[in-house]
Swiss-Prot record:
Family membership: Belongs to the TtcA family.
Enzyme Commission (EC) number: 2.8.1.-
Coiled-coil regions listed: none
Catalytic activity: cytidine(32) in tRNA + S-sulfanyl-L-cysteinyl-[cysteine desulfurase] + AH2 + ATP = 2-thiocytidine(32) in tRNA + L-cysteinyl-[cysteine desulfurase] + A + AMP + diphosphate + H(+)
Positions bound to [4Fe-4S] cluster: 122, 125, 213
Further comment found in the protein's record: The thiolation reaction likely consists of two steps: a first activation step by ATP to form an adenylated intermediate of the target base of tRNA, and a second nucleophilic substitution step of the sulfur (S) atom supplied by the hydrosulfide attached to the Fe-S cluster.
Organism per entry: Cytophaga hutchinsonii (strain ATCC 33406 / DSM 1761 / CIP 103989 / NBRC 15051 / NCIMB 9469 / D465)
Protein name: tRNA-cytidine(32) 2-sulfurtransferase
Length: 285
């Protein structure tokens, strides 16, 4: 039997294609490790108009070509900020053919009224948005709420809690809210921010800037972000090492008696109640 050979050279993947593949690999790694997508799911994809949430939506749209047994609905909260371009997302989502809902809620006025001069607005804004999104999730009957936090968000939150709250706590990839009504997932937790930024430029997403808090300088989150960036420059791959540490915990070498029984010298086997306490400057992108 004769074999047919070809001298045709297959083109190498472009940098953009390599980046897309890395993002999809990271997305699926989180999905598989934490069971973020299950048969019959109806997932509410929270869309702010920023690079992270646009990328998350794209990942879910692609995921539906692989798994066809779940639904998505994109939800945007219009907080009635001045000069907010409210036409952009409906036009974009209609063009994509994605099922969506725009929720109009004037949280902007509340944040402006309640935040003292010189203080950052992130915490209150986040709580108000979270409440509105949870109410919308209940109304729509979704099984999961998807948020677009990425790897750097997780690391920054870990150090913010460590430095300013005295807690070793980051952002879970999946958790249930205190009232037991909602499951929240973060499918981008393994995705790197710079890869998301590159993807956003490549896809030419119609980015909507946050004029409420984006102009606030000297926030602790920005300082922490710079600290991590400086570490990465001085010690390449430092962020990856720290991130891996979040998956490699030794309770017996810390001091939390809920995690380790120091009297009997054994790990706790009973399920711990999740402490879903507010995070330092946590936000929904």
């Amino acid at each position: 039997m004769r074999h047919t050979f070809t001298t045709e050279i297959m083109p190498l993947p472009t940098p953009e294609e390599k980046n897309i593949n890395r993002l999809r690999k990271s997305f699926w790694e989180a999905v598989e490790e934490f069971d973020l997508i299950e048969p019959g799911d109806k997932i509410m994809v929270c869309l702010s108009g920023g690079k992270d949430s646009y990328t998350m939506l794209d990942m879910f749209i692609h995921a539906q070509t692989v798994r066809k047994n779940f639904e998505i609905i994109a939800v945007n909260l219009d907080q009635k900020q001045p000069d907010y371009p409210e036409h952009i997302l409906p036009e974009y989502l209609t063009h994509l053919g994605v099922n969506f809902k725009i929720v109009e809620k004037d949280t902007y006025s509340i944040v402006i009224d309640k935040t003292p001069a010189g203080k950052t607005m992130c915490s209150l804004c986040s709580r108000l948005r979270r409440g509105s999104l949870y109410a919308t999730a209940e109304e729509l009957g979704v099984t999961k709420i998807a948020l677009g936090h990425h790897r750097e968000d997780v690391l920054e939150t870990f150090f913010l809690n460590l430095f300013f709250s005295g807690k070793m706590e980051a952002m879970p990839a999946k958790y249930r809210t205190d009232d037991g009504k909602h499951v929240v997932i973060r499918p981008l937790v393994y995705c790197k921010e710079n890869e998301i930024a590159e993807y956003s430029i490549y896809k030419k997403f119609p980015i909507i800037p946050c004029n409420l808090c984006g102009s606030q300088e000297n926030m602790q989150r920005k300082i922490t972000k710079k600290m991590l960036a400086d570490w990465e420059l001085q010690y390449p791959n430092r962020k990856e090492v720290i991130y891996n540490a979040l998956k490699n915990i030794s309770p017996s070498h810390l001091f939390d008696r809920d995690l380790y029984d120091f009297k009997e010298l054994k790990h706790r086997v009973e399920e711990l109640n999740e402490k879903d306490t507010p995070k330092v400057e946590e936000y929904i992108p």
